[in-house]
């Protein structure tokens, strides 16, 4: 478990802080048959080898692990603010605070972060996520990606050595759905329909959707009839009414 203290998914598919079953997303036998993934924050992160030196000029840490943590701090702040997909103000401020930018420079650093974090920068492959995808592929688990993106995500995932749509050098996804390409974005449940068409043999309630946003991913997956799982490696959502994991490596125990 990454970032200790995160409540992992029990083998019956439910998050059990304090021993209590949570949420409306239960499946009676707790076994799932396929997985859909968000891309940003789940498979790749904004490249810390770029953002580290950038924010170090404002007193921030350049350590990769600190920037990994900062992304999830930013996403938690974004979710608390119920911010839309296009509103990254709360994320930017939480990010620069998390990497310990000098307090009197945080507003300008957040603005610079906002102008630097382009779609193409979401390219740093999360090592344990890559390992998890390979393990799931070896088991024959059907997988796809559903991402709010800008037309670039299929190329980025392939170029970063994470996965590709169909057979190839890396892990095969049945489809990589990019919101810019299909014209609909999370939390609109219609975006998941493009992936579900590629998983016709599986009841949607037995498909996991793993994301890093409460507003976009958990809400969108629920509306589409999928079982949402939040990647929450630093226990930023202790009062969640949905399932959480600290790493994609924890998915193995949920799949039949």
PLM features per residue range, with description:
Residues 19-134, 138-142, 155:
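N-terminal helical cap/lid subdomain that shapes the substrate entry/recognition surface
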């Amino acid at each position: 478990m990454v970032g200790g203290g995160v409540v992992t998914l029990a083998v019956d598919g439910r998050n059990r802080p304090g021993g209590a079953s949570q949420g409306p997303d239960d499946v009676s036998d707790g076994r799932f048959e396929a997985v859909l993934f968000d891309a940003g924050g789940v498979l790749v992160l904004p490249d810390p080898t770029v953002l580290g030196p950038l924010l170090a000029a404002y007193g921030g840490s350049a350590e990769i692990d600190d920037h990994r943590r900062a992304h999830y701090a930013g996403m938690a702040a974004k979710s608390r603010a119920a911010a839309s997909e296009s509103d990254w103000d709360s994320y930017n401020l939480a990010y620069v605070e998390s990497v310990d930018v000098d307090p009197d420079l945080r507003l300008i650093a957040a603005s610079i972060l906002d102008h630097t974090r382009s779609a193409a920068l979401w390219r740093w492959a999360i090592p344990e996520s890559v390992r998890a995808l390979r393990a799931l592929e070896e088991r024959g688990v059907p997988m796809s990606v559903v991402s709010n993106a800008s037309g670039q995500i299929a190329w980025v995932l392939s170029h970063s050595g994470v996965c590709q749509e169909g057979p190839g050098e890396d892990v095969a996804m049945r489809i990589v759905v990019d919101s810019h390409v299909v014209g609909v974005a999370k939390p609109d449940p219609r975006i998941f329909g493009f992936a579900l068409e590629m998983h016709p043999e599986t009841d949607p309630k037995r498909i996991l959707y793993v994301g890093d946003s409460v507003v976009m991913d958990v809400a969108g997956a629920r509306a589409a009839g999928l079982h949402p799982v939040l990647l929450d490696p630093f226990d930023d959502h202790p009062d969640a009414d949905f399932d959480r994991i600290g790493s994609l490596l924890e998915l193995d125990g949920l799949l039949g």
